[in-house]
Amino acid sequence: MPAKDVIFGDCARLRLMEGVNTLTDAVKVTLGPKGRNVVLERSYGSPAVTKDGVTVAKDIELRDRLQNMGAQMVKEVAAKTSDNAGDGTTTATVLAQSIVREGMRYVASGVNPMDIKRGIDQAVSSAVMELKKISRPCTTGKEIAQVGSVSANNDRTVGEMIAEAMNKVGKEGVITVEDGKSLADELEVVEGMQFDRGYLSPYFINNPDRQVAVLDSPFVLLCEKKVASIRDLLPIMERVAKAGRPLLIVAEDVEGEALATLVVNNARGILKAAAVKAPGFGDRRKAMLQDIAILTGGHVVSEETGLSLEKVSLPELGQAKRAEVAKDTTTIIDGAGDAKAINARIKHIRLQIEEAASDYDKEKLQERVAKLAGGVAVIRVGAATEVEMKEKKARVEDALHATRAAVEEGIVPGGGVALIRARNAISNLRCDNPDQDAGIRIVLRAMEEPLRQIVANGGEEASVVASSVASGKSISYGYNAAMRVYGDLMDAGVVDPTKVTRSALQNAASVAGLMLTTDVAVCDSPKREEAAPTQPVHGGVG
């Protein structure tokens, strides 16, 4: 086991504080509309340029181990805020630095750190309640576009594109961000349920221009096992052909004479059909087949349900307004499923999301919700160079997270003003003893810091602006750093999601409180480099 260094008291706290300052000073230059970029070295390829606080924080590792421990604790603030709200990482880092810095002064002067932490917790709890009072719902496309624009560094195009995507796929729909192939940003919306499985034979194609098989008002046969024998498939094919409608088969696989018969019947015009493999694998395949069944109002043919292919009747098949089968994707549009059953299925999947342990499982479950609820929108980010594309893509992803947070918990005035208003509302808060009151004062001072940093990054005098904003009568009165004017920030479209501001304050206070109550730090001793062996010195020959 390697030797350890044990550092006590003020010496430990000061070294931790140095690490906090180093990381925060690198991150906080990105805050606000006038914030600067940070260039990050990469072991291969061109360097990354970013204005995203958590990306900068994650890239920083300090040589001094004790300082690095302090930096890693603040990095946790940024990462936790990013996970919870998707944005506000720089604000959280700035708040954490201020709480730690002010708190260290009180601890050094003999104030009880445990009481300071209790005071901090009380102040944060009261401030969060005030933020919720200030908050207002974010419902209109204009408000969603404003949130997206502010988060994307005042890029209106991004905000409007996200608002349009949300309008088309709904607030529950999935919106993904991908690299574009042109200079312009593009939005593509896939309506209905789409999964990544295509036709099993190109002979199903009936639209040569688009290279797809289009089925209007099809019946949908869902089967959990392989379909190889024509005897299994023939009865249902005859029933569908009599009904004069197309047939879409979604099964584990369709092969041999079953596939050949489908192709021949399709080519002769006897039965318009297409066959695709079921999406997913194992239990996920079963779940997705059930999703399609509920969406289309059909049943899954499986041994578990006791339903066999020979006995399937038309009422047990799913139905849809339209189906499009391409080489790699299948889209089912406007399924005939019962709305109550679909909503119940969505509710059931949401419960699974809450219980899911891994991010991968949560992502896949969220995709299933989106496919049932509305659709999928893809934003393709365009740029002239790869470096610019990476930076822009990160901004668009931040903006997307921010708009989701705004829809969830509402919006507050941006530019650090919401924290100033919450601060004014709790300025007379008192606790059980003077040491706890010191914790309240620390939080009150920290809540000014994001506004001060935004103003400082814009090249203005922070104290003058902070004083003017604090004395404003209206809740949404503040300083618009992008335009360098005072006014109503809500009207100007300078807004932040309530969830982002709340998460930033809570996470910053949580980690800062732990650092203030730390009295001993234990870390690995630096390895001493072994001296290089020296060659023996030989005397000269006389």
Curated annotation (Swiss-Prot):
GO BP term (any one): protein refolding
Keyword Metal-binding set for record: no
Where are the bilayer-spanning segments?
Answer: none
- Identify one Pfam family in the record: Cpn60_TCP1
Which cellular component terms (GO) are annotated to the entry? cytoplasm
Claim: Chaperone is one of the keywords in the record: yes
Top-tier EC class: isomerase
Cleaved signal peptide residues: none
Keywords in alphabetical order, please: ATP-binding, Chaperone, Cytoplasm, Isomerase, Nucleotide-binding
For this protein, the Enzyme Commission number is 5.6.1.7
Q: Where does it live in the cell? A: Cytoplasm
| Single Gene Ontology MF annotation | isomerase activity
Binding sites annotated in the UniProt record for ATP: 30-33, 51, 87-91, 415, 480-482, 496
Per UniProt, subunit arrangement is:
Forms a cylinder of 14 subunits composed of two heptameric rings stacked back-to-back. Interacts with the co-chaperonin GroES.
Q: To which protein family does this belong?
A: Belongs to the chaperonin (HSP60) family.
Concerning HAMAP family, the annotation shows:
CH60 (MF_00600)
- What is the protein's given name? Chaperonin GroEL
The record lists the organism as: Tremblaya princeps
Organism taxonomic ancestry? Bacteria, Pseudomonadati, Pseudomonadota, Betaproteobacteria, Candidatus Tremblaya
Gene name of the encoded protein: groEL
